[in-house]
């Protein structure tokens, strides 16, 4: 039983690392910047989704009234689906949380 738990833990962490390695270089660079900054509360994370058949990367806001960001695979900012004073973002990308699928946490600050 102990070995099964160990194998499960190792495989979970290696899957996250493998997903991160397939992320575009610009997203990996953003993660490098996050790692060089003090740990946030809540911890910073990057979540990959498929949105309208394309890979996108959602970065949640770190604090109240700030926008969350969604980037495409070239780090073009697509919009802010949530956050801001209303919590509703800027309305872009349109229907993000309804249409986005296959979420994968590719990085979370676990310091």
Can you describe what each PLM-predicted range is?
Residues 16-18:
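Bacterial signal peptide processing site
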Residues 23-42, 100-106, 110:
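N-terminal domain-onset segments
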Residues 32-79:
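Mature extracytoplasmic domains of secretory-pathway proteins
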Residues 83-111:
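C-terminal partner/receptor-binding element of secreted or periplasmic proteins
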């Amino acid at each position: 039983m102990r070995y099964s738990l160990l194998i499960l833990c190792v495989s979970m962490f290696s899957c996250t690392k493998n997903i991160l390695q397939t992320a575009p270089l610009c997203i990996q660079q953003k993660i490098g910047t996050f790692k060089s900054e003090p740990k946030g509360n809540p911890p910073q994370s990057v979540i990959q989704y498929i949105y309208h058949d394309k890979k996108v990367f959602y970065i949640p806001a770190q604090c109240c009234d700030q926008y969350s960001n969604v980037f495409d695979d070239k780090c073009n900012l697509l919009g802010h689906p949530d956050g801001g004073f209303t919590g509703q973002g800027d309305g872009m990308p349109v229907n993000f949380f309804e249409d986005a699928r296959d979420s994968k946490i590719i990085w979370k600050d676990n310091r």
